[in-house]
C-alpha cells in the first residue's frame, strides 16, 4: 500500500511539473523573455491609445491584440518560420500552423488590403475630384514624401525593398502600406503598420503646423468658387475610365485601384445597393478584424525591438510631413498660373495624403481660423480622394521597380 501511495504521489508531482513547464510563465523564465514582456507592455499601451484616446481604434485595437497574442509564450498562434524568406513554406505549413498563421495568408497573398479597398471605394464620393480635376495634381504632389523618404531610407542602409516599404508610410494609407510591405519586406510589416495607422490618427496634430508654416494669412483666406454639380453618368464612367487607364499604364497597381473602383461603381450605379451596403459594413468590418490581428501578430520581439524600428518611426513621420508639404507647395505654384476665383487655397493641398476624411477635415478649421466664412471641406475632399488613388499608384510604381 505504501508503494501505491508513493507511486501516486510521484505521478501527481510529475503531472504538476509537466503542467508547470507547459505554461507561458515557465517559458518566460526559461527563455528570459524580456523582449516578449516589453512587447506585451507595448500592446497594452496601444490598446490604451485605441480605447481611451480613440487613435484609429478600428484597426489599432485589433493590431494591439494580435501583438499581445503573438508574444504570449506557448500560445503558438503565429510562427515566423513558416514565412521565412518572404515565402510561405507550404511543406511544413499544415503540420505547424496556428490560427493566426492561417489568417495571415490573407495578408501575405494581398487579399485583405484589396478587400478593404473595395469597401473604401463604396464609401468614397469622387464628385469633388471630378468637379475639379486639378485636385489630381495635388493628390499626386502629396506622394512626394513617399519617394523622398525612399531615397533617404536607402541612403541610411536599408535595402531598396525595405526603403520602398518605409516610404509608402508617407501616403498615410494603412491598407496600401500593408499590401506593399507584405510583398517587399514582410519582416517590417509590424512596425510599418503601427507607424502608418498611428500617424493617420495624428493627422490633426502633424499637419496644422506645417500648413501654417508654408502659407501666409492672405493665402489661407482665399475663397474658392463653388464646385459644379456632377452628373450620375460622370460618376459611373469615372471608375471605369480610371481602372482602364491605370491598369494599362501600371499593371502592378491594378489590384488596389481595380478593387477601389469596383466598390465605387457599386455605390454609384444604384442597381446593387445590397452589395454596396455589404462591402461598406459587414465585409469591411470582418476584414478589418482579420487584418488587424494578423498584422499585429507579426510584431514579435525579434522583429520589433531593434534600432531599425526607431528609424522606421522617424522616417515615417518625415515622409508624412513631406507629403503634406508637397501638396501645399504645389497649390502655391498653381496659383501663379491662376487668376481671380480660379485660385486655390493652399490649405487644401495638405489633404492630398490619403487619410480620408481626416486630412480634409483638418483643412476646414485651419481655413476658418483665417476667415470664419470660408468653407473648404468639399474643396479639400477632391485632393483627399485623389490621394487614395495616388498612394495606390505610388505603390504600383514601387512594386514595378522593386517587386
Where are these regions (language model features)?
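Alpha-helical transmembrane segments
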Residues: 187-205, 313-323, 346-351
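Interfacial helix-loop-helix linkers and transmembrane-helix boundary segments
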Residues: 51-60, 78-79, 102-103, 123-138, ...
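Alpha-helical membrane segments and immediately flanking helix-loop junctions
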Residues: 108-109, 117-123, 138-148, 152, ...
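Entry/N-cap segments of selected transmembrane alpha helices
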Residues: 33, 129-150, 302-328, 380-384
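Hydrophobic transmembrane alpha-helices of secondary-active transporters
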Residues: 46, 104-130, 263-266, 284-306
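Transmembrane helical segments that form the transport core of multi-pass membrane transport proteins
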Residues: 243-331
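N-terminal alpha-helical transmembrane segments of multi-pass membrane transport
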Residues: 1-84
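Membrane-embedded hairpin module used as a gating/binding unit in multi-pass transport
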Residues: 198-271
Amino acid at each position: 500500500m505504501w508503494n501505491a501511495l508513493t507511486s501516486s504521489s510521484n505521478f501527481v508531482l510529475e503531472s504538476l511539473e509537466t503542467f508547470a513547464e507547459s505554461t507561458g510563465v515557465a517559458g518566460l523564465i526559461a527563455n528570459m523573455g524580456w523582449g516578449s514582456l516589453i512587447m506585451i507592455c507595448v500592446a497594452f499601451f496601444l490598446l490604451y491609445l485605441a480605447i481611451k484616446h480613440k487613435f484609429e481604434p478600428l484597426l489599432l485595437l485589433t493590431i494591439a491584440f494580435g501583438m499581445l497574442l503573438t508574444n504570449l509564450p506557448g500560445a503558438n498562434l503565429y510562427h515566423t518560420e513558416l514565412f521565412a524568406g518572404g515565402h510561405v513554406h507550404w511543406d511544413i505549413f499544415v503540420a505547424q500552423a496556428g490560427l493566426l498563421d492561417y489568417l495571415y495568408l490573407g495578408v501575405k497573398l494581398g487579399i485583405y488590403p484589396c478587400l478593404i479597398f473595395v469597401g473604401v471605394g463604396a464609401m468614397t464620393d469622387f464628385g469633388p475630384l471630378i468637379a475639379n480635376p486639378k485636385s489630381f495634381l495635388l493628390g499626386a504632389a502629396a506622394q512626394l514624401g513617399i519617394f523622398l523618404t525612399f531615397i533617404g531610407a536607402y541612403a541610411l542602409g536599408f535595402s531598396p525593398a525595405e526603403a520602398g516599404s518605409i516610404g509608402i508610410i508617407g501616403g498615410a494609407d494603412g491598407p496600401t502600406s500593408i499590401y506593399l510591405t507584405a510583398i517587399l519586406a514582410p519582416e517590417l510589416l509590424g512596425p510599418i503598420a503601427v507607424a502608418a495607422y498611428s500617424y493617420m490618427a495624428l493627422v490633426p496634430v502633424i499637419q496644422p503646423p506645417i500648413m501654417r508654416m508654408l502659407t501666409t494669412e492672405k493665402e489661407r483666406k482665399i475663397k474658392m468658387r463653388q464646385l459644379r454639380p456632377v452628373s450620375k453618368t460622370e460618376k459611373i464612367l469615372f471608375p471605369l475610365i480610371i481602372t482602364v487607364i491605370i491598369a494599362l499604364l501600371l499593371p502592378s497597381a491594378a489590384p488596389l485601384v481595380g478593387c477601389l473602383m469596383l466598390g465605387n461603381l457599386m455605390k454609384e450605379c444604384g442597381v446593387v445597393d445590397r452589395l454596396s451596403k455589404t462591402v461598406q459594413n459587414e465585409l469591411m468590418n470582418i476584414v478589418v478584424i482579420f487584418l488587424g490581428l494578423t498584422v499585429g501578430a507579426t510584431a514579435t520581439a525579434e522583429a520589433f525591438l531593434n534600432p531599425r524600428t526607431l528609424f522606421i518611426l522617424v522616417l515615417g513621420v518625415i515622409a508624412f510631413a513631406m507629403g503634406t508639404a508637397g501638396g501645399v507647395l504645389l497649390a502655391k505654384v498653381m496659383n501663379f498660373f491662376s487668376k481671380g476665383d480660379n485660385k486655390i487655397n493652399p490649405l487644401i493641398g495638405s489633404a492630398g495624403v490619403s487619410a480620408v476624411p481626416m486630412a480634409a477635415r483638418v483643412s476646414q478649421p485651419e481655413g476658418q481660423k483665417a476667415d470664419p466664412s470660408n468653407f473648404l471641406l468639399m474643396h479639400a475632399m477632391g485632393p483627399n480622394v485623389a490621394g487614395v488613388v495616388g498612394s495606390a499608384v505610388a505603390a504600383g510604381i514601387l512594386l514595378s521597380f522593386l517587386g
